[in-house]
């Protein structure tokens, strides 16, 4: 919705849906930050993504790396920062929305960094150490019928989430998305293949998906960058 609004915001004659959609996008962003994230002071200054409004969180409540989308949070943050306050028919849930979005972005980056080696699992658990750094929490967690430690149908989405961040915010990619994706791309460039031993079972069903997803990262970044240029140049 935000991209659709941005695509036409400079048009002299805007579509009939323009105001309705941008108000809905703003309200949806506020609802997401309110109901789909956790702010628990016992885990330091982190705002953690949940797996929906009713599950997911710290420790045994579980995490899924592919749910984290820092680029989407930046998009919502910036959209809300520029949204006309007079058009809102509700009270914002936080006095400083930008700060709360930035906390969520930083926490998601920390979660993604923890899980990467450089691939990520379908599911996992996280907590914080004595210095409030995000670390792993031992134990099992899974959902959707996919194994916890497999780079499978859940985990493969993580690449696209991070690539979206790099494409939408290229000036910020050096701090997170570029080094994150570089490890994955480097493995493929070096002809990485899983050992044909005990770990093969975790790759057999997803080899095509794995190689396709990773090898297409650069192409997807180019495509999204082009889309961004088109959106910002429309008048």
Specify the residue positions occupied by each region the protein language model found:
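Long, hydrophobic/aromatic-enriched structural stretches that serve as scaffold segments
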Residues: 1-17
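Extended ligand-binding clefts on enzyme/binding-domain cores
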Residues: 15-232
């Amino acid at each position: 919705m935000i991209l659709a609004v941005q695509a036409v915001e400079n048009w002299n004659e805007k579509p009939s849906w323009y105001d309705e959609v941008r108000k809905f996008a703003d309200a949806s962003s506020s609802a997401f930050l309110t109901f789909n994230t956790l702010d628990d002071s016992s885990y330091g200054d982190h705002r953690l993504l949940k797996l929906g409004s009713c599950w997911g969180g710290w420790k045994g409540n579980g995490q899924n790396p592919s749910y984290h989308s820092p680029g989407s949070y930046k998009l919502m943050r910036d959209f809300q920062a520029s949204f006309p306050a007079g058009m809102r028919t509700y009270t914002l849930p936080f006095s400083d929305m930008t700060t709360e979005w930035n906390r969520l972005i930083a926490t998601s980056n920390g979660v993604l960094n923890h899980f990467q080696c450089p691939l990520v699992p379908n599911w996992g658990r996280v907590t914080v150490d004595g210095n409030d750094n995000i670390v792993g929490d031992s134990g099992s967690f899974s959902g959707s019928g996919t194994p916890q430690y497999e780079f499978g149908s859940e985990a493969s989405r993580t690449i696209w989430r991070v690539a979206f961040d790099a494409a939408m915010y290229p000036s910020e990619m050096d701090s997170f998305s570029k080094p994150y994706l570089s490890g994955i791309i480097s493995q493929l460039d070096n002809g990485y293949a899983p050992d044909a031993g005990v770990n093969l079972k975790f790759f057999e069903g997803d080899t095509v998906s794995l190689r396709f997803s990773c090898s297409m990262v650069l192409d997807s970044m180019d495509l999204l960058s082009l889309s961004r240029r088109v959106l910002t140049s429309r008048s």
